[in-house]
Every structure is written in C-alpha cells, then in structure tokens.
Amino acid sequence: MRRLLLLLLLFLPAAPAAALRAVSLMPSYTEIIFALGAGDDLVGVSSFCNYPPEAAKIEKTGDYLRPNIEKVYSLKPDVVFTGAWAGKSVVKQLSSLGVKVAALPEEKKAEDVLTTVRLIAAALGRKEAGAALSARLSAEFKSMPPAPKRPLKVYVEADDGGWTTGSESFLSDAVTRAGGRNVFGGEKRGYFQATWEEVLLLDPEAVILLSGSAREFEARPMAKDMAAVKAGRVITALDRDAFTRPGPRLPGEINRLRMLLYGAK
C-alpha cells in the first residue's frame, strides 16, 4: 500500500506555486508584468498605470513619486516594484515596514528595457516568461534599420515648459534608433528644461511634440522660420505613453517614429 501511495504521488501534478502579491509603482513595470502573463499577481498599481486596460481595475496606490505608503502596506504585498531613481524615501519607508522592495535601475538606453524585463521576471518567479519576452523585444530592436547617412536633427518636447531630454535618458537613444539625432544629445542629463531661444538656435529639422498641438507650437515666436515647421515635421501622432515608457510597446513606437520622420522606406 505504501508503495502504491508513493507511485500515485509521483504521477500527481505538482501543486502550483502560491501566487505572489505584487504592487507596481511605475506604469512601464505594470505593462511588463502583464506582458509576462503575471497581471493576476498585481494587487496595486500607481494612479498613472493605465495600460493594458485591465490595469484600470486594480487598486490604485497614488502617484509613483509619492505613493500612499499606508495603502501599499495594507495590500500586504510580497514585493513592490519601483524605480531606484524615483525616491529613496519611498524605499526606506516601505522597507522599514518589512515590505520587500525591488528598486530597479533607470533605463538610460532603449534596450535597457531588456534588463528590466529580466529583473521583474526573476522577482516574480517567471524567468522563462522573462527570457521569452526579452528575446522577442531584443529581436525587434535588432531588426531596426541602420541610421541614415545624415540623420534629421530632432527636438523632443516631452512636456509643456520646454521639458526635453539629454543623453542620459532612453528617449534620446530612442530618437537615434528611429534614425534621428537629438539636438540636445550632447547634454549629459536626463530630463531638463530648455529655453525657447536654445531650441531656435539649434534649428531642428523635426519636432516630436508629446504635449500640446502642432498649431500651438507653430504659433510661438519665430517658429515659422524653424526648419521643422517649414518641412511640416512637427510630429504629434506618437502614442505618448508607449513612447515615454521603457516597456514592451517601445520598439513598435520607435519604428512608428521612423516612418513619421522618413516615410515608409
């Protein structure tokens, strides 16, 4: 009888691992978690986590820079995902409460999303799914055409007030991969405010406008003399979230930007 029981145990399916309770404080991490097939592990997300649509049904924990610590703690998470750059105080407060925090490094190149995918997958016990997603995204990056001999000079206006990007942000690299050259690529900074005078002096040949309308941009002082305006390359058609989040949708949006810059070639 004992031998029979042992044989039965050998052939019974293994009990599934207990699902983790995860909180994501970054929209890009939320997208990655869903892409890994781990959306059901999420018990809390930031108020900015709006993709995929299923994220809207998950408990909100506030701004990713200033999350509601009590709310996060009340969700009894096994792990909380946040950016190491987003605020040491958040990590410190949660850690002091005994909450495990995965503070992930900032993506400074577009392909850094592959590292983020692997780190999140490992923390969730989904290494195989992480390897598969990482391989798919890597293939998408590798399939991108080489840069043209003379890349267009591109100004990225990420937000009102002249907020733009220097070489320390993955957005600058995204522009390069799309075949452009960031006019502020020489700035060893991430995000900063450029003056309108600086933009005019650099005379970009294309503008990526992630906030506001082309009409408003073209109405600015002396904008009509800018090469981008003359060429009709004030681009507003990008999906802001897909382009500004280092997640699974980024390679597709980079390819879309290339088409908007150069047409279907």
Language-model regions, residue ranges each:
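Extracytoplasmic substrate-binding proteins
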Residues: 21, 89-163, 184-186, 202, ...
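Solvent-exposed loop/turn segments at secondary-structure junctions
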Residues: 28-32, 48-51, 80-81, 86-88, ...
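His/Asp/Glu-enriched short active-site or ligand-binding loop at hydrolase and phosphoryl-transfer sites
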Residues: 46, 168-191, 233-236
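A ligand-binding cleft/hinge motif common to bilobed small-molecule-binding domains
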Residues: 86-96, 206-225
